[in-house]
Structure formats: C-alpha cells, structure tokens
Amino acid sequence: LLHCDFVYVSDEARLAMPFVSLGLVPEFASSLLVPRLLGNVRAAEKLLLGDPFSPQDAVDAGIASAVLPAGEVVNHARRVAERFNTLPPGAVRETKKLMRRASADEVLKTIAVEGELFAQRLRSPEAMEAFQAFFQKRRPDFSKFS
C-alpha cells in the first residue's frame, strides 16, 4: 500500500503489519516509509506490535486515501482510474517523478536491505515457530529464543 498512488479501503478491511509477530522484518521499505508517515512512536506500535488497525486509522495516517463501503471500492477505483486516464500523461509522469525523487534512492536501498534480512528471517527458528503455531492454531512460544 505504501507505494500506491491511490488506496481505497473497504470499511470491512482488517489491516495490520504483523512482520515481527511472524518472526520477520518489514519489507518493501516499510521500515523507512511507515515512520515517515506516522512518526517513530506510532510506527513502532504498528511495526513492532503488529496490532490490527481500522481502515479509518489508515486514512488518518496517510496510508489510505478513503474508506468506502465494501461493495463500492472497485467501482470507485474504476472511476478514479478513468479520471486519471484523462490527464496529460507527460505531466502525470513528471509529477510522479518529482514526488518520489528525493527518496527514490533511499527507498531502493532500504528495500534491498530489508529483502536480505527478510529472507534470513524467513528461515529463522522464530519464523518457523510462528508459522507452525499459525497452522496448528495456537499461540507461538518465543520464550526459548532470547
């Protein structure tokens, strides 16, 4: 969601960033972009604890554009896409470049670092415990990992 131009969320959506609770690390520059959007304290709450948050919280944080009734999300997105397609493509392209210019290198570097760590964590005993617990429908026990 953090790399999308427009994000429309159903009022029935359940959102979370459960990386750590799964024994993983954030990916796709989430560790860079979430603190920029939310500030460090609120980002720590979302990224470290992974607690669910509401669609309206996502809008308030700048992660989503709007909350819509479940049956209207796709049609709304189509209307926005149709409107978007009427805009001058060169101006759109250059504006998007300008919007991302300052952070593009930093985002790419962060994605690379996160990708390496994510791959390592995916094979970690902690992640294995989290995945096994999920499939066994039990709470993971991380007490043996210090």
PLM region spans:
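Hydrophobic alpha-helical segments typical of transmembrane helices
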Residues: 29-33, 42, 91-94, 114-117, ...
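CoA-thioester-processing core
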Residues: 2-48, 60-61, 76-80
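K/E-rich alpha-helical interaction surfaces of small helical-bundle regulatory domains
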Residues: 9-10, 48, 128-140
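C-terminal long alpha-helix characteristic of the crotonase
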Residues: 8-13, 55, 59, 64-120, ...
